[in-house]
């Protein structure tokens, strides 16, 4: 029997907690209070979904209200553009300059207007923005040659990968 939308999607402002014992719906305040105690919180989205980005912004704002010492990491930016992110957060660049200098079109390419509200929030509150990615050439090289074939000096600061946890082959 197919699940109804009510069974799958919580009401706006609610979160679904999934565990071994099943699903439960939790209020935003309770979840935000718990998340604000964590060192790292990952907020995923479909890159082209405006609602997902709005949810991310609301979650970031709620976390910032509880934990102002916050930093935001972004998967789309290679580490080489970190100085641009720093300039943006410091209020030194226009949107156009930020998008051009971060090489937005080639490093990401999705509609920047989906992301700009989050970038503006970070800038408005002087929240550090962290470039988390590496250059595509490094990704392709590792795929082609393997991690061990890349000299440490050419790994863009990335350390040795951690071993897989026991449940994984």
Language model regions located:
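Short hydrophobic beta-strand that contains or immediately precedes a catalytic carboxylate
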Residues: 41-44
């Amino acid at each position: 029997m197919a699940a109804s939308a009510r069974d799958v999607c919580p009401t706006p402002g609610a979160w679904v907690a999934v565990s071994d014992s099943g699903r439960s719906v939790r209020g935003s305040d309770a979840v935000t209070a718990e998340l604000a105690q964590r060192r790292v919180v990952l907020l995923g989205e479909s890159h082209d979904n405006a609602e997902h980005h709005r949810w991310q912004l609301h979650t970031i704002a709620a976390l910032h209200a509880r934990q102002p010492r916050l930093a935001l990491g972004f998967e789309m930016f290679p580490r080489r553009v970190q100085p641009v992110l720093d300039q943006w957060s410091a209020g030194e660049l226009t949107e156009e300059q930020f998008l051009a200098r971060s090489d937005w079109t080639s490093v990401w390419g999705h509609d920047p207007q989906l992301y700009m509200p989050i970038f503006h929030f970070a800038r408005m509150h002087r929240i550090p923005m962290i470039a988390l990615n590496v250059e595509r050439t490094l990704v392709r090289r590792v795929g082609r040659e393997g991690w061990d074939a890349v000299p440490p000096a050419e790994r863009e600061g990335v350390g040795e990968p951690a071993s897989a946890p026991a449940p994984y082959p």
